Amino acid sequence: PSFEYGDLTSIAVHPKENVVVASVQAKGYNDEGYAVFLSGDGKFLSAVKVGVQPDNVTFTPDGKKALTANEGEPREGYGEGVVDPQGTVSVMDVSKGFQHVTAETVTFEAFDSKRDQLVKDQVILKKNTAPSVDLEPEYITVSEDSRYAYVALQENNAIATIDLTTNEAISVKGLGFKDFSVKGNELDLRKDGKVQLQNENVNGIYMPDGI
């Protein structure tokens, strides 16, 4: 396809075939990116449009699907007239060959009506935003049976689960907070040239990047 490319953010190697896939963001921050499939010797096989700002790509263990975590960050900041793209996960079927790949993009729109519950479950969300916009997929891992994808939502301090049989987001779970006043959770907050671990009356947010 002809499009202005931005960052190449991630690559993955197929578990069985001599094929790699790369996630490529568009130059425009609010434009959809592509998953590009190449043979092991660099021959172009296909390119499939995915969501906005694909940040990570992986194959399922059975090799039948590829997935991208499309972060959809508001890279131009917040404010009037600024677009905050939806965060999504694209699921690609590669079972019919790497030159005949089809893609379906999974959104989090089903959670827009559950915003209050997400906040109660300690999912971090910006005020007055819909979860489908504010959730930002960062990284994906897939269960050994290739049935479920687990998606790190770093800025939201949460993990989403995607059912790969139905290609639906079925849960978003907050990871809670780390209490540094508890014994065993000591840290050093002081920039004084010394290393002195001690408890502090603060909480931390896990915010996982990889998973």
Where do the PLM segments sit?
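Mobile, glycine-rich extracellular loop/lid and propeptide segments
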Residues: 1-184, 200-210
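Extracytoplasmic loops and strand-loop junctions of Gram-negative outer membrane beta-barrel proteins
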Residues: 131, 193-195
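Solvent-exposed loop segments that connect transmembrane elements
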Residues: 185-191
